[in-house]
Amino acid sequence: MVEVIDGKLIAASVIQTVKSATAALEMVSGVTTGLAVIIVGDDPASHAYVGSKSRMAKECGFKSVQHTLPAETTQEELAGLVATLNADPSIHGILVQLPLPKPLDSEPIIQSILPEKDVDGLSVVNAGKLATGDLKTGLVSCTPAGAMVFVRRTHGEDLSGLNAVVIGRSNLFGKPMAQLLLNANATVTIAHSRTKNLAEVCRNADILVAAVGRPEMVKADWVKPGATVIDVGINRVPAPEKGEGKTRLVGDVAFREVSEIAGTITPVPGGVGPMTIAMLMANTVIAAHRAAGQVPPKF
């Protein structure tokens, strides 16, 4: 019988740890964890996402600051705000909501955030720390960090002897996910759109992570019996059964058929998704502990 991972439940337990750690830090050192979120322009999806991040930060007991800037904000103005937040000791995490409206260039903005405040884990310094196995001072990108919580809950801390395949090589997810698996001693293969015999490569995986943005691409015959399958894809597909023009969310894995083969699987929605915001909160409270010279909590 397959185990379907309840992402909402595990995210809630992460948030519980964040709340306890936030309160303990305040009690021991008088430091209130601070998160600043910057949003530029009026994209409704971005505003909804930022709203949920800010609400969650307040729920965790953080000082939560939201900077809403007009679409015509210049590169210099945005860079200036980041510099101000970098210099503010009451802010431990800085998040710039992407994508930025054109013609703003997000890359120099992201790289200008102090690595110790880069709670999205997107700076080249944090990417480099992960690549060299430094998980003590770096911050890890939230979605792979969340997916890794699932892997550890199923397989433990040490993945020695297990084969892991990550489909997707993005800087945002695929590469950091592979590094995390490698740091835990898994034997890791990164597959992608140019990989030959992709199904065959996937069939060797004890842990299969799909992050390519192709609806239900991973079929049952790609999966080793009993494997752990982590589905990071979020795809909208037509759902005529719901009515004309309606859509539904599916992952990169054909959930129903793969559930017959896998040992453990994450659903879409309700799997990796809820973990992303939870791990953002985790990174922020970790950053606050480090800034205060305290030992950060483990997730």
From Swiss-Prot:
Quaternary structure (record): Homodimer.
GO molecular function per UniProt: methenyltetrahydrofolate cyclohydrolase activity; methylenetetrahydrofolate dehydrogenase (NADP+) activity
Binding site for NADP(+): 168-170, 193, 234
HAMAP family membership: THF_DHG_CYH
Associated pathway: One-carbon metabolism; tetrahydrofolate interconversion
Reaction(s) catalysed by this chain's protein: (6R)-5,10-methylene-5,6,7,8-tetrahydrofolate + NADP(+) = (6R)-5,10-methenyltetrahydrofolate + NADPH; (6R)-5,10-methenyltetrahydrofolate + H2O = (6R)-10-formyltetrahydrofolate + H(+)
InterPro entries in UniProt: Aminoacid_DH-like_N_sf, NAD(P)-bd_dom_sf, THF_DH/CycHdrlase, THF_DH/CycHdrlase_cat_dom, THF_DH/CycHdrlase_CS, THF_DH/CycHdrlase_NAD-bd_dom
Keyword rRNA processing among record annotations: no
Alphabetical GO biological process terms: L-histidine biosynthetic process; methionine biosynthetic process; purine nucleotide biosynthetic process; tetrahydrofolate interconversion
Function: Catalyzes the oxidation of 5,10-methylenetetrahydrofolate to 5,10-methenyltetrahydrofolate and then the hydrolysis of 5,10-methenyltetrahydrofolate to 10-formyltetrahydrofolate.
One GO cellular component, as annotated: cytosol
Record-given protein name: Bifunctional protein FolD 2
Keywords in alphabetical order: Amino-acid biosynthesis, Histidine biosynthesis, Hydrolase, Methionine biosynthesis, Multifunctional enzyme, NADP, One-carbon metabolism, Oxidoreductase, Plasmid, Purine biosynthesis
Gene designation per UniProt: folD2
Pfam families on file: THF_DHG_CYH, THF_DHG_CYH_C
Organism from which the protein derives: Rhizobium etli (strain ATCC 51251 / DSM 11541 / JCM 21823 / NBRC 15573 / CFN 42)
Family named by the database record: Belongs to the tetrahydrofolate dehydrogenase/cyclohydrolase family.
Enzyme Commission number(s) of this protein: 1.5.1.5, 3.5.4.9
